């Protein structure tokens, strides 16, 4: 299995095959029966991740709402404007904002959609392609230390851990360290590069139709604040934050329009994490039988 994984094999299929082989070996050795395998492995495994899967879906939906309402693109544009004509400061601010966005946002679609905006700006600031991609992904990863959606996934593997102040002290400290590494990487590289200022034109690609009002820019922080300060559960926090973004950006002008955008963003959110959900349902089969 290790060789299969190193060669780039599909881990979801690999875990399913391994779980099936181990079940067969257990039955041959008389350790378990087919009835036990059905209930505890093939049925009980995926069911044990049901609550986590739902949180993943709502987190991905929230990410789609941030994109469709223009909150993410506007936040990035304002960050570039704040940096002014200082490329290093602009780059650092972009990485910081990316980390903050992904403290609550989840889903591959959100990573791609926001990356499409940020990466061209980083490249125009003189950041080499490998460093631009690495810096962006590390900034995304820094936010994941306190992202409750990812925490719930890990909680399924390591039971007993709580999303409380003890964990958050570590989470925010780890986030700060990772962002600091990104800042150092970029700072050292930009000092060796002749920077051009074509980033202004790149930043201008965010059209006025996509701009969200300033009070909508707090949306990425709402789920985090509700979870940490007010001890809310993640799903209600995502729902409140999503409707706040839809309302203040004027996306809810009628009931039909509300139905349309919620259905569309929810659909896109589920599609974004479909392969992840498949993996999350197969993995516990392997865990149970092992």
Predicted regions and their residues:
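Transmembrane alpha-helix interface/packing and boundary motifs in multi-pass membrane proteins
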Residues: 3-8, 63, 97-106, 138, ...
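Residues that define the loop-to-transmembrane-helix transition and helix capping
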Residues: 12, 88, 130, 164-165, ...
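Juxtamembrane membrane-interface segments at transmembrane alpha-helix termini
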Residues: 24-37, 122-129, 145-150, 248-260
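Alpha-helical transmembrane segments in multi-pass membrane proteins
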Residues: 14, 18, 22, 26, ...
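Alpha-helical transmembrane segments and their helix-start/interface "positive-inside/aromatic belt" motifs
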Residues: 1-13, 121-125, 129-131, 265-272
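Membrane-embedded alpha-helical segments and adjacent helix-loop junctions characteristic
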Residues: 34-120, 256-290
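Membrane-core helix-loop-helix motifs of multi-pass transport proteins
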Residues: 119-208
């Amino acid at each position: 299995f290790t060789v299969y994984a190193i060669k780039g094999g599909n881990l979801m299929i690999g875990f399913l095959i391994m779980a099936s082989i181990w079940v067969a070996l257990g039955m041959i050795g008389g350790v378990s029966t087919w009835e036990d395998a059905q209930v505890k492995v093939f049925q009980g495994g995926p069911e044990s991740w049901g609550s986590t899967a739902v949180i993943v879906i709502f987190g991905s939906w929230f990410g789609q709402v941030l994109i469709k309402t223009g909150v993410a693109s506007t936040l990035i544009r304002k960050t570039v404007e704040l940096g002014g004509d200082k490329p290093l400061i602009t780059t650092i601010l972009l990485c910081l904002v990316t980390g903050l966005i992904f403290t609550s946002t989840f889903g591959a679609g959100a990573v791609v959609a926001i990356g499409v905006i940020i990466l061209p700006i980083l490249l125009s600031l003189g950041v080499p392609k490998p460093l631009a991609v690495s810096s962006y992904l590390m900034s995304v990863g820094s936010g994941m230390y306190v992202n409750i959606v990812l925490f719930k996934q890990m909680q399924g593997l390591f039971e007993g851990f709580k999303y409380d102040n003890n964990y958050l002290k570590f989470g925010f400290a780890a986030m700060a360290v990772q962002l600091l590494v990104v800042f150092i990487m970029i700072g050292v590289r930009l000092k060796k590069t002749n920077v051009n200022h074509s980033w202004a034109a790149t930043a201008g690609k965010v059209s006025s139709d996509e701009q969200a009002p300033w009070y909508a820019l707090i949306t990425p922080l709402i789920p985090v604040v509700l979870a940490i300060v007010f001890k809310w559960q993640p799903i209600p926090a995502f729902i409140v934050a999503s409707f706040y973004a839809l309302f203040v950006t004027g996306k809810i002008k009628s009931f039909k329009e509300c139905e349309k955008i919620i259905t569309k963003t929810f659909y896109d959110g589920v599609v974004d994490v479909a392969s992840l959900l498949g993996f999350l349902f197969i993995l516990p089969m392997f865990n149970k039988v092992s």
